[in-house]
Amino acid sequence: MVLSPADKTNVKATWDKIGGHAGEYGGEALERTFASFPTTKTYFPHFDLSPGSAQVKAHGKKVADALTTAVGHLDDLPGALSALSDLHAHKLRVDPVNFKLLSHCLLVTLASHHPAEFTPAVHASLDKFFSAVSTVLTSKYR
């Protein structure tokens, strides 16, 4: 999915507003994912998946850091996320549908923390961005 110049502006502006909360929001989005879609827990059998878990928060920070990298490379997502795509496709073998589930929970988390900024245009831009990231992360599955 191609991001328009307006989408790129919206994504960058939103990520700037998130600032130092990206890791926190990543952890919260993972908690939402595990609660809403329990089958996603199967990829983390060694984690304490209880609310507020340090392991979930740490992995949420990894997710947020990867998204921050993607935001910094909106014109070359495949290049920026190539190693992560290899990891998820070849080593972790994450079912691609899980990226959509996490993307949804990321949108909910961001909307709950920034309701005034979460306009329909921003929502659409972030949805397209998360979809583009998901597409890149699943590109090596073929």
From Swiss-Prot:
SUPFAM superfamilies, per the entry: Globin-like
Coiled coil: none
Keyword Heme in annotation: yes
Domain Globin positions: 2-142
Modified residues (N6-acetyllysine): K17
Positions of modified residues (Phosphoserine): S4, S36, S50, S103, S125, S139
Modified residues (N6-succinyllysine): K8, K12, K17, K41
GO cellular component: blood microparticle; haptoglobin-hemoglobin complex; hemoglobin complex
Chain positions found as Phosphotyrosine: Y25
Sequence positions that bind heme b: H88
One Gene Ontology biological process: hydrogen peroxide catabolic process
Tissue expression as described in the entry: Red blood cells.
Keyword tags: Acetylation, Heme, Iron, Metal-binding, Oxygen transport, Phosphoprotein, Transport
Gene Ontology molecular functions: haptoglobin binding; heme binding; iron ion binding; organic acid binding; oxygen binding; oxygen carrier activity; peroxidase activity
PROSITE patterns: GLOBIN
Modified residues (Phosphothreonine): T9, T109, T135, T138
Chain sites annotated for binding O2: H59
Keyword Heme assigned: yes
Family designation: Belongs to the globin family.
Assembly notes: Heterotetramer of two alpha chains and two beta chains.
Function (record text): Involved in oxygen transport from the lung to the various peripheral tissues.
UniProt protein name: Hemoglobin subunit alpha
Organism: Ailuropoda melanoleuca
